[in-house]
Amino acid sequence: MLPLVLNPVNLKVGLAGRGPARDRRAALLAEAGVEARLLPEPVPDDLLAALQVLFVAGLPEGEARDLATRARALGVLVNVEDVLPLCDFHVPAILRRGDLLLTASTGGQVPGLARALRESLAEQFGPEWTVRLKELGAARAKWRSEGLSPGEVSQHVRELMVRMGWL
């Protein structure tokens, strides 16, 4: 697996499915700032062709397989919730603290383990990290504006975290 963090601003994302599974996926996407297009049933090829990424949740496996095959043929990356062989990518367990994004993934093998790791991270990185990240970001910007090298900036960031007892 290759972990990527995508900026959702220019991403064309679709969501197909039914019921609570689709609703949960819609909520996850919205929380990430993704404006996913809710697709009608049946999904026409022209709507699929306009997408870059398709999420499928709450469909029977046969329907999901057919939709995934059609989408892939049009160059769309596909994630079918809980059907590993139909996924081009996986969504990790996510912990957000403002702009701080911590994730855990098992490549789709053991989602319960990824969830447990996320819960452990949540205990280690509480809500205070939202403010800490802003403080570190401001300090980093200052050091960069002073002309420090990337290595020096990195060292200063580490020293500040240690001095503040954050890590």
Each language-model region and where it sits:
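ADP-ribose/adenylate-binding Rossmann-like module
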Residues: V53-L54, A64-V91
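Short glycine/serine/threonine-rich phosphate/pyrophosphate-binding segments
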Residues: R22-R24, E63-A64, L113
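Short amphipathic alpha-helix with an adjacent loop that forms part of the alpha/beta core around
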Residues: V43-A50
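An accessory alpha-helical subdomain
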Residues: G108-L167
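Hydrophobic, well-ordered beta-alpha structural blocks that scaffold small-molecule cofactor pockets
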Residues: M1-P42
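Short basic, glycine-rich beta-strand/loop surfaces that mediate nucleic-acid
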Residues: Q52-L59, D88-Q109
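Short, ordered loop/turn segments at secondary-structure junctions
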Residues: E41-V43, D82-L86, G107-G108
